[in-house]
Design a protein with these regions (language model features):
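C-terminal and inter-domain tail/linker signature
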Residues: 1-160
Length: 160
C-alpha cells in the first residue's frame, strides 16, 4: 500500500507526474488520478473539474493548445506529515496553431498536490502565469509599466 505521508512516495509521484505530462500520453496522465479527482486549474479551465472521466477533455485540450509543451522540475517541496507536495516547474513550448508558430513561451508554475487516495492524486491545484505566457506568444500586448490589475483592466478597454 502506498502512503502519501512517506517522503519517498511524494518524490516518486512527482517524478511519475512529470514523466506522464512530458509523454503527451493522456492515458499515462489519467493513470495517476483518482477516479474522484478534484482538479482546480481555473487559470486555464472555466471551472473546477470533478472526476477522472471529465479530465480526458482537459488533458487533450492541453496537448492541442500547447502541442510541444515540456515541463522541467525546478524544485519539489513536500509536507509528508500532511500528505501534500508542490512541484515548482518551468514549462516551455509553442502555443496553439492560430498564434505565431515562430514564438515560444517559457514560464514558471506550480503543481500543488493537496491530497491522495489509494496512492492516486485526489485533490489538485494549478498556479502559473498565463498572461506572461500569452505575451510571449504575441497574443497579449506588453504591460507598458502597468501594475497589478491595471494591466488586465487595460485589456478590457482595448476591446470596447
Amino acid at each position: 500500500m502506498t502512503d502519501a505521508h512517506d517522503p519517498a512516495f511524494l518524490r516518486r509521484f512527482a517524478d511519475d507526474w512529470l514523466t506522464a505530462w512530458n509523454s503527451h500520453d493522456t492515458e499515462q496522465v489519467l493513470a495517476l488520478l483518482h477516479p474522484r479527482i478534484e482538479w482546480d486549474d481555473t487559470v486555464f479551465w472555466p471551472e473546477v473539474i470533478h472526476g477522472r472521466d471529465a479530465m480526458r477533455t482537459y488533458v487533450d485540450r492541453i496537448w492541442a493548445v500547447m502541442p510541444d509543451v515540456r515541463f522541467e522540475e525546478v524544485q519539489l517541496f513536500t509536507a509528508p506529515a500532511d500528505g501534500r507536495a508542490l512541484v515548482l516547474f518551468r514549462q516551455e513550448g509553442s502555443g496553439p496553431p492560430q498564434l505565431d508558430p515562430g514564438k515560444r513561451f517559457s514560464t514558471h508554475g506550480c503543481d500543488i498536490f493537496l491530497g491522495f487516495t489509494d496512492g492516486l492524486l485526489s485533490r489538485y491545484l494549478a498556479q502559473y502565469e498565463i498572461t506572461d505566457m500569452m505575451r510571449q506568444l504575441g497574443a497579449l500586448p506588453p504591460r507598458e509599466g502597468k501594475v497589478g490589475g491595471a494591466y488586465l483592466l487595460s485589456l478590457m478597454s482595448r476591446n470596447r
